[in-house]
Amino acid sequence: MAGNSIGQLFRVTTFGESHGIALGCIVDGVPPNMALSEADIQPDLDRRKPGTSRYTTARREADEIQILSGVFEGKTTGTSIGLIIKNADQRSKDYGDIMDKFRPGHADYTYQQKYGIRDYRGGGRSSARETAMRVAAGAIAKKYLRERFGIEIRGYLSQIGEVKIDPQTVADVTKINWQQVADNPFFCPDKSAVEKFDELIRKLKKEGNSIGAKLTVVAENVPVGLGEPVFDRLDAELAHALMGINAVKAVEIGDGFDVVAQKGTEHRDEMTPAGFLSNHAGGILGGISNGQPIIATIALKPTSSITIPGRTVDINNKPVELITKGRHDPCVGIRAVPIAEAMVAIILLDHLLRFKAQCK
C-alpha cells in the first residue's frame, strides 16, 4: 500500500487506522525557524473532530495532537516533524456483525479483493478518521502560508442535499462573511440556510439515513506563478489532493461544470491594467496561479453507513442483508470543510516551495 504520501518538497505521510492505537504523520519540508506548538494545530483539529455537535457522529475523540519531533525550543528545525493522535473512543464491538460481510458503498469489498485481508473495524485505513492527520499537517502549512506570504485558506459549506445557500452570499469571495461561517456548526455563510440545514439533518437522523453535500475552499493572496506544467499543473494537483478525501466524487476549479453552458465571451476573464474583470477560471490559467483567489469546490456522497437495511454479500459471495451499526455522520460534508482546507494548503505550500526553488 504505497499511496500514503503527498507532496514533493512539502511532503506529508500519514499512518494509522480508525480503531488502532493511534494516528500519525510525518511532515517533511517545513522550513526552519517557524514558531510552532500544539496550540497552532489544535484549533483546526477541533473543527474536524467528531462529537462536537448533534449534526455529526456521536463518537467522541479529543483528537489532542502531540508533536514528537522537528521542533526545538518552540521553533521548527527543518527536520521531519512527527505528529501523533491517540485513539480513545473506539467501539470495535459494533463491527462484529460485519466481520465477514461487505458494507455496500464502502471500501470493504475492494480492500478485501486487493489485499486479501482488511481491518473491518470502522473501515480501518479507509476510514475518514485518517483525515485528522491531514488536518494537522495542513494546519502547519496554513500557518506558514499565512505568516510568510499572507495567504488565507478558508472553506464553507454551500449545499446539503437539495438545500442550497443564497448564491449572493458568496458571489464575491473577497466579501464572504467568514465570521458567520465560523459561528455555526455547518460552516455556512448564509444565515438563512442554517435553519434549513438543521431541519434536514434532524429529519435524516430520525430516518436513519444520510445525505451528500457540496463545499468550497477559497485561497486568497496566492501569488502568480504556482504550478508546474504540464503534468503538475496547479489545478491538476489540487484536484488530485481533493479527490483523495474520503467520499469526494467530484472536484470543480472555478466555475467547474457550469462552463459547459457558458460562451467564450462570458467565460474568458478579461483583463485591464487594473486587473481581471472576472474569475471564472478560479485563479488558475494554464495550470499556473494568476494572482486571483483560487476557488475549488468538491461534492461528497452520502455515507453508506446507515441503519436502513440493505442488500450485500459476504466473503463467500452469499447474499445477506445488512444494517450498519456504530456511530456515523448523517452528512460527512459538514466535517469535511477543514479537511479540504488542509489539502489545499498542503498543495499550495508544496508548489510555493517548488516555485522558489526554480524561479526566484
Curated annotation (Swiss-Prot):
InterPro entries referenced in this protein's UniProt entry, alphabetically: Chorismate_synth, Chorismate_synth_AroC_sf, Chorismate_synthase_CS
Cofactor remark from the record: Reduced FMN (FMNH(2)).
Catalytic activity line of the entry: 5-O-(1-carboxyvinyl)-3-phosphoshikimate = chorismate + phosphate
Pfam family, one: Chorismate_synt
GO biological process: amino acid biosynthetic process; aromatic amino acid family biosynthetic process; chorismate biosynthetic process
A single MF term (Gene Ontology): FMN binding
Pathway(s) of this molecule: Metabolic intermediate biosynthesis; chorismate biosynthesis; chorismate from D-erythrose 4-phosphate and phosphoenolpyruvate: step 7/7
Needed co-factor(s): FMNH2
Positions of NADP(+) binding: R48, R54
Transmembrane segments annotated in the record for this chain: none
CDD domains: Chorismate_synthase
Coiled coil: none
GO CC annotation terms, alphabetical: cytosol
Disulphide linkage map: none
SUPFAM superfamilies (alphabetical): Chorismate synthase, AroC
UniProt record similarity statement: Belongs to the chorismate synthase family.
Protein function: This reaction introduces a second double bond into the aromatic ring system.
HAMAP family, sorted: Chorismate_synth
Record text on subunit structure and interactions: Homotetramer.
This protein's name: Chorismate synthase
Native source species: Actinobacillus succinogenes (strain ATCC 55618 / DSM 22257 / CCUG 43843 / 130Z)
